[in-house]
Structures are given as structure tokens and as C-alpha cells.
């Protein structure tokens, strides 16, 4: 489901990715159950077959003299595969935006980690929670108990009301949260919001949090994609700008720390504990 529409996505036998209406134009059977064969998706009910553009290719239950497949077409959306993610555009054809070229989409595949997870809330609620920094003094307090870097151990506890500064940009905004530390030092954390649904974290260096376990510098972020008014799919990405790619152990750690590992999710990407 995407923006309230029930769609089916598939990669045909030629490697092309299609995204189209889930239901067959004939009797509205779900194409999620369809057979992916010879350049198209065939409905299991009466065998109507569609290509990645939604064009009907075959109507085996229709007599040759009444075959009208040329007049049948499902609603379909254009797709592009960039950075290991399938992107689509669902708006007016005359306003198609350029393809995304964030740095994480341009690095080799083994330098990035991707995951996704379904959140049962509106996408804007999820986005607001992600870019909110003030909650960390309470919600994430326990995460700093074992920190080893001097000066950072108690900053959540000692400065629970950070000073927030917002900087408007042409892509959205950046805001910083500044917390006072002992000995007249400050801890400054910045988030980037890139319209319409991206959050960028600051670079993670190898002294605290998950980066310490990776031993590599990383940048990470989230995309909050609306499924409908009550559900969103959160895409999590991390990439390293180190000389060496992410190892198998790095990817396992990121799977546990960011989003959820695959064994913690149901088939529709819900967390198991939320079933």
C-alpha cells in the first residue's frame, strides 16, 4: 500500500520493475497471487497477463475474434532503481522530479546498509518523532550508561532542555540542539530534514553508539513513506565513507541497531512484538 493505494510490485523476467494496481481488470482478483512469467504478471483466476506498464498482453479465456486486450490497461507508475531502493513517482506526468542522488545512493552496494520497517502510525508522526531531539534526555537515557568518552556520560541527564536553533534551507531545514556540558563545553547535535520525508543524522564517528562497534565513520538516516493515514513504511539507510566496505558483522550490527533485523519482523515488516 502506498499513499492509500493498493499496488503490486514485481520484477519481470527481463529484469524490469513494475508497480501497478493490485487488482486484475477482469474480475478484480489480486495480482499479488499472480504468476511472474515471460515478461509479465499473469492473473491466477482467468490468466489475463500484464506487463510492467499495466498493459494487458494476453486474454486466454477470450475467443480470438473478441479479444480486446489492446483496450485494457491497469494504472501503473514509473519506477527507477537507485541506491538499492525502488523509487516511484505518482504525481502529474508534467512534474516528474529528477531521480534522487543522495550520497548514500551513489556509493557501492557493500558500503551501505538498508532495511525497512512498518510503523503503525501516520508518517508525519513518525517523522516528527525522529527529528525531535529533546526527548532523548528521557527516552534514551539508559543508552549512555556505558559510554567511555569523558564529558558525554551524563549529558542527557544534566541538560534535558537543549537550546534549539532552526536554519531554513532550500531543501527543508537543519536544526541544532545544544546542550551544556561540564567545564563550559557544549554538545551540539544537528539534524537535516529534506522534504518531503527524509531525516539525516549527523556523521557517526567511532567513539560512541553503534559507530564504536563498527569502527567505521558512518552517516545514516530514515525515509518515512506514507502507506495510508494510519501506517507508514520506514526505510533506514546507513553508509560508510571509510576506505573499507561494511563487513558481514557490520551489517548484522546495523540490522540490530537501526530498524529491526529480519528475524524480528513479520512478513509485512511489522515488529513481531506488535503483532
Residue ranges of predicted features:
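Rieske [2Fe-2S] iron-sulfur-binding domain
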Residues: 1-113, 163, 183
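C-terminal catalytic domain of Rieske-type non-heme iron oxygenases
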Residues: 16, 93-275
